[in-house]
């Protein structure tokens, strides 16, 4: 495509189109969460986030490059999102972005990020108050990351304790807790405001490098499909097209093998299709799956 080589998460039916998370050969990495409270105009043609990220991966090396990239894009940008970026020089920031402007949130600012990290779901802090989505999931993640902090943040712990978490902060329940487990009753539970949801299609942890390290060591840990029924595969840009066959497009399945198998297991978990059945998950089956996809689920 020209520019930097990159590795990205794409839709199975559009591999040359939008990129939803990715890293390039310089260690620059990007992701986004959709925002639902930042748009302040009536422009109809939107949803260019994935195309924006694909372009950024080709031309950006640093967080500052991304900022310049946003500055020079034609308006309207046709996005409403929180873009998260890191680089190989210690840069880390979110950019709350709408059609005309962006608001930078620097993860290295101790006043803004005293714990050294920022958490986003589907609203922007600069957006309209109490609009947007994901407020309960935001509180879930805050608690999970606070508890995780003392033991250190590793890809394995983030996948296990966040991506596969069934904690709900508003209800103060954790389905992984033996005493609160739905297995004590029918084995079924209503899915509402957990981090993994029916519509979840992947979970990715990008393990960056410290300043001075080889940016080729930047690792894109990738779990395709429904995160609780998937496994994480490490990927590197330098491998080019020689990535694991589990995560690359398979014409026989019209998706990646890992995604296909994960979704088959997910279908068993969300097996009720009449009425409001898709709001219910079969925890007993999911628990059995977690025993195999997770190193140490709680009893």
Language-model-derived ranges and their functions:
Residues 1-50, 63, 67-92, 98-132, ...:
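A contiguous strand-loop segment
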Residues 11-14, 35, 86-89, 164, ...:
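Short, flexible beta-strand-to-coil junctions
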Residues 32, 46-74, 138-176:
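Alpha/propeptide regions of enzymes that mature by internal proteolysis
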Residues 62-64, 68-69, 124-153, 157, ...:
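A short, charged
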Residues 111-153, 201-205, 214-236:
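Long, His/Glu/Asp-enriched segments that create or flank divalent metal/ion-associated functional microenvironments
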Residues 177-189, 193, 198:
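Alpha/beta-hydrolase fold catalytic core
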Residues 192-291:
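Substrate-recognition/cap regions that form aromatic- and gly/pro-loop-enriched pockets
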Residues 292-299:
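Conserved small/polar residues in nucleotide/adenosyl-binding loops
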């Amino acid at each position: 495509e020209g520019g930097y080589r990159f590795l990205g998460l794409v839709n199975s039916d559009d591999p040359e189109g939008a990129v939803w998370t990715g890293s390039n050969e310089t260690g620059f990495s990007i992701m986004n969460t959709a925002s639902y409270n930042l748009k302040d105009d009536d422009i109809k043609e939107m949803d260019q986030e994935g195309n924006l990220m694909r372009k950024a991966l080709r031309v950006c090396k640093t967080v500052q490059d991304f900022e310049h990239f946003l500055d020079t894009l034609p308006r309207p940008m046709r996005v409403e999102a929180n873009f998260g970026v890191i680089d190989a020089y210690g840069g880390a920031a979110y950019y709350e972005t709408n059609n005309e402007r962006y608001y930078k949130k620097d993860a290295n600012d101790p006043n803004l990020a005293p714990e050294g990290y920022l958490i986003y779901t589907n609203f922007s802090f600069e957006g309209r108050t109490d609009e947007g989505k994901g407020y309960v999931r935001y509180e879930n993640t805050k608690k999970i990351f606070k508890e995780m902090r003392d033991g250190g943040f590793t890809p394995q712990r983030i996948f296990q304790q966040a991506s596969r978490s069934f904690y709900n902060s508003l209800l103060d329940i954790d389905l992984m807790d033996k005493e609160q487990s739905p297995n004590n009753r029918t084995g079924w539970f209503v899915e509402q405001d957990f981090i993994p949801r029916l519509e979840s299609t992947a979970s990715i942890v990008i393990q960056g490098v410290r300043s001075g390290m080889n940016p080729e060591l930047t690792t894109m840990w990738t779990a395709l499909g429904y995160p609780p029924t998937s496994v994480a595969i490490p990927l590197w840009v330098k491998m080019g097209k020689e990535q694991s066959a589990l995560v690359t497009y398979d014409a026989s399945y019209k998706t990646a093998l890992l995604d296909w198998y994960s979704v088959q297991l997910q279908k068993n978990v969300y097996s009720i299709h009449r009425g409001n059945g898709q709001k219910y998950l079969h925890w007993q089956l999911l628990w059995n799956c977690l025993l195999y996809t997770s190193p140490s689920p709680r009893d």
